[in-house]
């Protein structure tokens, strides 16, 4: 029997190795911002998520930029689908990975459109390196409390083998509800999300690579190990 996996990210995903049910823990709400705050030209535009691409797309025509950097293979794939040329994508799919491998020069003007709750590591690190950074809050994330309760009920009836978390926002939404401590079913897609879960007092497994495919591989490996296969 395939492992039953509850996936909590906002976009759907399927994998033949497991039985997936999507239970998004957060929803995104568009925010208003004054587009007059945008400069006419940037050296770099940075997208750190698929949502950033989706919410900023209507504003692309208002600016000119020389090059585009993205975080994550899924973000790049969405850009490719929308005919947006990507110039740089780090091999480590995280803000830290982008900073450590970044091609920006001191004095470059960089625009980062993202969520209101986005981590500030990248913008702060770039500023400290002498790069001019503008951060725009395009949207915010809010918990979906009915989804949190649905997962808690499923856990109570032992009808799940794994629960996955693809963002710190989703982790906060769920673990702040004080779910049971079950070290065998919580899985994180990346080190930053895993760190958030651990800071909230819980343990989890972490995907080897920051992709959904890698996380499913980790789930299957752990399921076979636990079953003694």
Where does each model-flagged region fall?
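Signature of uroporphyrinogen-III synthase
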Residues: 1-229
